[in-house]
């Protein structure tokens, strides 16, 4: 009897594994994990060339991991076990105070060589663009840097100030930098970043928008009147959650609804709408894509104030939630994601003849963005 009880956990485990394997065998391959928010490796095609150079073996290993029976459940189970053992860092994500999930950044993400190349390209592009436009640069700090007091005790983390010092030194002569670190730091006790996602919230974006308005000499009273949001979701689980399939508290998504009648053209005529929001994404695991329907190559937005100004915004996903604020302040707003568009910075200046330019990136994403180095050099 004792032997039976000793073997029981192993028997149960094998039964569960075989059951999951059987279920998976009867189902189709998955191409996307809504939990991890990423594409999954499907069964790779075999060829002699791919076997000899090792590409097939590498992809097949990824295929086995990604198509493992009940993968989403195992990711969650692994996280629970590591938490039970007292770990506070899982898959480069810290379990922080007040239920914040904070990414562990290192010099891998802030590679000095890539940063140097990107800053060189940024300085060169700003120098050209300033000849015909009013140019500003805004780098948004990571959540882990602004909320570093919420990190576990003695948790190692990248000292992001090194990046800002290099940025300041490179752009000091140009006088184009809008530093949002101080204002975000001043409001860090407010919900300026999502708990389960690496992006800032609409509130965090609004504080940055207020700083931008001050820098360009805009209507500050009008900008402050936009600090009114509507909650559209209370069950948002973001990218950081997806890495470990764990969260103690869901996020809410709030939006600013423009008083102006906007007209939005997607990707040079691919689609036309009257809003910067795609509410269909609220029914999916990728709720953050409610902002502009995800990252688009080009957005052309009109319907704002009639002042003859065109703002060219070169950005990453952090800018998606600031667009509704900016759209009202310009006769035309052109939004470009260089990661999605095979066009150089010089060509953008020729195509849209902007009167104003804002380059807005999250610091970690800018540090890793090789597309910026290539297209703005």
Task: Label the predicted regions.
Residues 1-377:
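Extracellular glycan-modifying ectodomains
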């Amino acid at each position: 009897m004792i032997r039976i009880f000793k073997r029981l956990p192993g028997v149960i485990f094998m039964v569960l594994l075989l059951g999951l394997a059987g279920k998976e065998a009867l189902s189709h391959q998955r191409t996307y994990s809504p939990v991890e928010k990423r594409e999954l490796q499907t069964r790779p095609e075999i060829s002699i060339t791919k076997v000899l150079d090792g590409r097939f073996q590498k992809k097949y290993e990824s295929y086995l991991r990604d198509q493992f029976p009940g993968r989403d459940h195992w990711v969650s189970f692994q996280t629970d076990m590591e938490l039970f053992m007292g770990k506070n860092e899982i898959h480069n994500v810290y379990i922080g105070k007040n239920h914040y999930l904070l990414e562990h950044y290192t010099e891998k993400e802030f590679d000095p060589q890539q940063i140097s190349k990107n800053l060189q390209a940024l300085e060169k592009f700003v120098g050209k663009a300033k000849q015909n436009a009013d140019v500003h640069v805004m780098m948004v700090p990571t959540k882990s840097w602004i909320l570093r007091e919420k990190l576990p005790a003695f948790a190692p983390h990248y000292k992001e100030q090194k990046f800002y010092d290099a940025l300041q030194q490179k752009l000091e002569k140009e006088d184009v930098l809008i530093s949002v670190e101080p204002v975000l730091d001043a409001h860090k006790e407010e919900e300026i970043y999502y708990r389960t996602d690496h992006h800032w919230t609409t509130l965090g974006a609004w504080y940055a928008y207020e700083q931008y308005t001050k820098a360009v000499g805009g209507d500050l009273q009008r900008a402050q009147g936009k600090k009114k949001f509507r909650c559209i979701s209370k069950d948002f689980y973001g990218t950081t959650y997806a890495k470990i399939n764990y969260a103690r508290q869901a996020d809410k998504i709030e939006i600013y609804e423009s008083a102006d009648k906007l007209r939005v053209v997607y990707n040079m005529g691919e689609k036309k709408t009257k809003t910067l929001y795609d509410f269909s994404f609220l029914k999916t695991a990728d709720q953050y894509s409610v902002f502009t329907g995800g990252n688009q190559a080009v957005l052309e937005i009109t319907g704002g104030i009639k002042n003859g100004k065109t703002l060219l915004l070169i950005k990453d996903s952090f800018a998606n939630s600031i667009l509704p604020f900016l759209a009202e302040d310009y006769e035309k707003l052109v939004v470009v994601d260089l990661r999605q568009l095979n066009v150089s910075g010089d060509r953008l200046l020729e195509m849209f003849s902007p009167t104003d330019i804002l380059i807005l990136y999250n610091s970690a994403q800018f540090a890793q963005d090789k597309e910026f180095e290539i297209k703005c050099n």
